[in-house]
Amino acid sequence: MRKIIHIDMDCYFAAVEMRDFPEYRGKPLAVGGSSDRRGVISTCSYEARKFGVRSAMATAYAFKLCPDLILVPGRMQVYKEVSLQIREIFSRYTPLIEPLSLDEAYLDVSECQQYKGSATLIAQAIRRDILAETGLTASAGIAPVKFLAKVASDLNKPNGQYVITPETLPDFVKTLSLRKIPGVGKVTAEKLSSLGLNTCGDVQAYSKPELLARFGKFGGVLIERSQGIDERGISADRERKSVGVETTLAKDIYSLEQCQQVMPGLIQELALRLSRSAKERKIHKQVVKLKFNDFKQTTIEHRSDEVSIVMFYDLLAQAMARQEGRGIRLLGISVGLADSILAVPEIPNAQTQLDLAL
């Protein structure tokens, strides 16, 4: 049985700011773009979260929830330098490290002999080292499989950890909400709920052939995850080829204008994900994807090392020309990443690599 640790830094960008600027401590603080440029919140302190402020939220709306919010621009170079420190700490315990972003990673410590091979003690040691050497706290989840380690890391935040052992896994999974399974978003969860499926235990008791008939390949994944099965290994040399975001719509939409109304939220989320990328790399294309209500899809791309919102809207219009009267059930945007590293100055906010000036 594998031993997987998921490390997640606690409100990372904001925590770095509070470490370096003590006057921010204990106050509602957010890192993100300014409201007058339609900025988005990258992350925020726990004090800000008490007011309902969240990552990926429009900055203007965050100020409505918390008028006393302190907003600071991101210092991406600093965040990257600290992330490298944290990565070096990971490497003391295992070479099998899969970074997900600057502030989280999977570690496979199955072969680690330190602390007599106890993943629980290894996670404690890693968190202790991070605090001692960076002044930042981290939370951890420990489990035999990746997705449950990630779920567990969120259960004892901040500055804590949660363990799912092989013995406790069956009972833990049985009551786990399906929303915790990767790929189950709001719309999919509603469809599952309409079938009486809300927890992994519900799926375990449901007809497997019917799930496969209704959800195809994803139905098979759902069956496995609901039993706590996740055979994915740690991709130690993983390098993302693209960064994207998509949304499955609650109801099919049919007009270009309706699709255009969905775009601002997608663009804000894409900007946030780009700002959290572990490396700055050249962008070589941008892409718009539509999935129709007959489950066929189309993609339109534009090759360029400069990305603009205007082009996203142009690509959307081109994709809609292929609609042929069908309803749109999913809309997505992404950028393709080249192998070489960017040699341009840092843009210190959540709009990194996106020209948000229409």
From Swiss-Prot:
One of its GO terms (cellular component) is cytosol. Keywords: Cytoplasm, DNA damage, DNA repair, DNA replication, DNA-binding, DNA-directed DNA polymerase, Magnesium, Metal-binding, Mutator protein, Nucleotidyltransferase, Transferase. It catalyses: DNA(n) + a 2'-deoxyribonucleoside 5'-triphosphate = DNA(n+1) + diphosphate. Mg(2+) binds at D8, D103. It comes from the Bacteria. GO terms for biological process: DNA-templated DNA replication; error-prone translesion synthesis; SOS response. The record marks F13 as: Substrate discrimination. One of its GO terms (molecular function) is damaged DNA binding. Binds 2 magnesium ions per subunit. The keyword Transmembrane helix does not apply. InterPro entries: DNA/RNA_pol_sf, DNA_pol_Y-fam_lit_finger_sf, DNA_pol_Y-fam_little_finger, DNA_polymerase-Y, DNApol_IV, IMS_HHH_1, Rev_trsase/Diguanyl_cyclase, UmuC. Its main location: cytoplasm. The active site is at E104. Pfam families: IMS, IMS_C, IMS_HHH_1. It is an enzyme of class 2 (transferase). Residues 4-185 form the UmuC domain. It is found in: Cytoplasm. Its cofactor is Mg(2+). Its EC number is 2.7.7.7. Monomer. Belongs to the DNA polymerase type-Y family. Poorly processive, error-prone DNA polymerase involved in untargeted mutagenesis. Copies undamaged DNA at stalled replication forks, which arise in vivo from mismatched or misaligned primer ends. These misaligned primers can be extended by PolIV. Exhibits no 3'-5' exonuclease (proofreading) activity. May be involved in translesional synthesis, in conjunction with the beta clamp from PolIII. PANTHER family: DNA POLYMERASE KAPPA (PTHR11076:SF33), DNA REPAIR POLYMERASE UMUC / TRANSFERASE FAMILY MEMBER (PTHR11076). This is DNA polymerase IV. The gene is dinB.
